[in-house]
Amino acid sequence: MKSAELKSFLEIPYDELEDMNLKAAQRAEKAGAKELEQEYTAWLKKEKHIKAVTLCFSDIEGRLHMLDYDKKFLLESLGNLTFDGSSIRGFTPQHESDLRLGVDWASIRYFPADVLGAGKVIFFASVLNADRSPYRSDFRGVLKSYTENLKKKQGVTAYAACEIEGFLVDGQNAEQRYGEDGFKLISSGGYYHSLPMDTLRQFIDKSAEAQRALGFKNEKDHPEVAPSQFEMNFSYADVVRAADHVQLYKLICRQTARSMGHTATFLPKPFVGINGSGMHTNFSLSKNGKNIFYEAKRKDGLSDVA
């Protein structure tokens, strides 16, 4: 008997994942933090096919850090999920290294097993001081606190949609090996120009499929202006969820590229003589379900707020 047959960790088809993640996002909009915590801790206790819970946070330079907690340990230690902040660039000095993670239960994503591994579920986390006060360099936490106050005091919800460009380059770990070989393009096509089954198109298709499974509301995807450059567009979300989308988008692209023997890089200017990569960000504000940037009778439909 093969060892793989002894394991029965959670692996969910992409179409089911999409439904689960969309429902989780809708649930997060309606339920409070305590209610979500009760629901998901109960689910984790019951779901025998989950082996680990992945918690994510970002450092001050935007790197995504991921810690896998054994499910049972996490459930027993929710008030004391410690990590060494001195090992994170720009965080605490060594003598103040004791930081905590607080699970943001509204951020749950049921992840494709072929991207993150079977038997895992992922949450973003807030970084906390030892006394569980918000850590000053947790910019996601700062954004979350600001938007919650904006909603509470003014009834305003902030939305964003990001258009993230990147390059697909030849070989795994190409960024780490740049000093040896530089970057090598995998496609000579340009804007909207890629044959249906060439390497860049296959990469875009696979990445977009994983994003859809994660609950991204995909709109369009295409090769960008420069050779080997890509962009995949998806719909807006509240700004905290939109920020999470940026990190997940990059994670998915990197994992997909790696599985194909290549590297997805989001460096702003990796090549001389051709376009670099950027990230247009579209913002809007909503109050009582209405876009307060819009006013039909004003010039160009723009309100005073805009």
Positions of PLM-derived features:
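Detector for methionine-enriched segments
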Residues: 1, 20, 66, 197, ...
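ATP/Mg2+-dependent ligation/transfer catalytic cores
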Residues: 1-220, 242-245
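Structured core elements
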Residues: 54-56, 66-68, 124, 167, ...
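Short, charged/polar low-complexity linear motifs in solvent-exposed/disordered segments
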Residues: 82-85, 236-237, 259, 283
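Secondary-structure junction/capping motif
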Residues: 134-142, 172, 238, 258, ...
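Histidine-centered divalent-metal-coordination microenvironment in nucleic-acid enzymes
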Residues: 163-177, 223-237, 267-289
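Accessory "access/gating" subregions that flank catalytic or transport cores
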Residues: 195-200, 204-218, 232-239, 250-266
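Glycine-rich anion/phosphate-binding loop at the beta-strand->alpha-helix junction
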Residues: 241, 246, 250-306
